[in-house]
């Protein structure tokens, strides 16, 4: 019998949250949080992505290129031969990822002669459009937009009417047929999930000892209200099913009711406690907030050493690894600020300069039928032993020492 743990989705999010973006909780997870709910072992989770958790069909989004992190547009351009540009960065909330993105963008601005006007929208679609209109009226030169997908059609119209170039960050704007409609720098969540599965299947003995694979529970903690998180969990599960179709009953699918560390904490703790016969676990938390909750659950249950946690995102993990904390968090796919904002900065400045147009920008990477190019930054699994080398290599690609 398939052991799905499906936590019923509530309609509290009419829009899509963005990859690894921080949720609505900055509090430490509490085992007594009254906002959590259990799930049924027999119910099927809802899905906002392609495919479903119970399906063996490939649910990958249309594949773009998984590119080298450097966009390669800067070259020998003298950015200081012109007046400074003003670039508006509009983002969903003040989560650590967006703080890091803003800082990285400001650093690129010092090298590429632009200032940054950054504004958070508190996940309010109306506020997003207000910010965009206000910045259009101020006469900013370009936009980088990292917000909820329901605003995309209107923001696209507004910026086309204003004649101001923009690039979506993290979340592409797809039409009903799945075609990308505006330049975007994005994280390939499906590939990241697949990479995570490959990594743990190759490396789990180093962390879980001589446990037989058939005895290990594979828990995926996701949030299917948001497509980008669904893609990550789909990538991980599709790859696992492809390699080990006989281990379907080892999968435990936890679909959270909200983007919350607390709910992740309670859900992971309940799943582990409710399946006491499973001695070893691998937990893939598709967002770093969920990984924080999972880490705390592992600690509170005194299961460090018999459970390992994997995630996508790095704002908390790199700091904890640097402090030799959370030994159960063993690997992740970074959403690194230099990769994302370096490519985005190079792209938007090329558009504002007129060196590139929406049609020519990264055209060699464009998928058939797309109106504009979706540029995927590279995905790579790193550990506490390799993450510093990863940071140094990616930063060096963008000239950061």
Task: Enumerate the predicted regions with their spans.
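Bacterial lipoprotein signal-peptidase II cleavage site
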Residues: 18-32, 36-42
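Hinge/cleft segment of the Venus flytrap/periplasmic-binding protein
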Residues: 62-83, 215, 221-223, 336, ...
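Hydrophobic alpha-helical segments within soluble ligand-binding/sensing domains
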Residues: 72-74, 79-83, 183-216, 264-265, ...
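An alpha-beta-alpha
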Residues: 87-91, 105, 195-244, 251-253, ...
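Periplasmic-binding protein-like
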Residues: 88-89, 139-147, 165-169, 219-220, ...
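Hinge/beta->alpha junction and helix N-cap segments in small-molecule ligand-binding domains
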Residues: 90-102, 118-127, 170, 185-195, ...
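Hydrophobic alpha-helical
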Residues: 143-161, 236, 256-321
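Flexible loop/hinge segments that line or gate small-molecule binding clefts
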Residues: 155-191, 214, 316-326
């Amino acid at each position: 019998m398939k052991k799905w743990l499906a936590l019923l989705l509530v309609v509290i999010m009419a829009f899509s949250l963005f990859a690894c973006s921080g949720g609505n909780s900055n509090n430490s997870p509490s085992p007594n949080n009254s906002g959590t709910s259990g799930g049924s072992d027999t119910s099927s989770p809802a899905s906002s992505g392609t495919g479903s958790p119970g399906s063996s069909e490939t649910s990958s989004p249309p594949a773009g290129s998984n590119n080298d992190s450097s966009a390669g547009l800067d070259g020998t351009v003298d950015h200081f031969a012109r007046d400074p540009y003003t670039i508006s960065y509009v983002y969903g909330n003040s989560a650590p990822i967006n703080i890091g993105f803003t800082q990285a963008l400001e650093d690129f601005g010092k090298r590429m002669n632009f200032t940054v006007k950054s504004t958070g929208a508190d996940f309010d679609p109306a506020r997003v459009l207000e910010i965009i209109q206000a910045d259009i009226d101020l006469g900013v030169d370009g936009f980088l937009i990292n917000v909820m997908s329901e605003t995309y059609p209107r923001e696209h119209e507004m910026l086309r009417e204003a004649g101001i170039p923009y690039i979506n960050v993290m979340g592409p704007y797809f039409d009903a047929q799945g075609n990308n409609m505006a330049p975007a720098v994005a994280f390939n969540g499906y590939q990241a999930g697949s990479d995570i599965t490959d990594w743990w299947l190759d490396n789990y003995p180093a962390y879980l000892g001589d446990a037989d694979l058939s005895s290990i529970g594979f828990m995926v903690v996701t949030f299917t209200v948001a497509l980008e998180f669904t893609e990550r969990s789909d990538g991980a599960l599709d790859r696992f099913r492809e390699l080990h179709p006989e281990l379907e009953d080892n999968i435990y699918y936890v679909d959270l009711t909200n983007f919350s560390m607390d709910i992740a904490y309670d859900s992971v703790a309940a799943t582990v406690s409710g399946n006491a016969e499973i001695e070893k676990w691998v937990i893939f938390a598709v967002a770093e907030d969920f990984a924080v909750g999972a880490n705390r659950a592992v600690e509170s249950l005194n299961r460090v050493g018999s459970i390992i946690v994997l995630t996508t995102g790095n704002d908390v993990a790199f700091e904890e690894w640097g402090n030799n904390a959370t030994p159960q968090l063993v690997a992740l796919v970074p959403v690194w600020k230099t990769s994302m904002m370096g490519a985005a900065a190079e792209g938007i400045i090329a558009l504002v300069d007129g060196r590139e147009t929406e049609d020519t920008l990264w055209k060699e990477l464009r998928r058939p039928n797309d109106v504009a190019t979706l540029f995927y930054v590279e995905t790579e699994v790193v550990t506490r032993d390799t993450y510093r080398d990863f940071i140094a290599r990616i930063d060096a690609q963008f000239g950061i020492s």
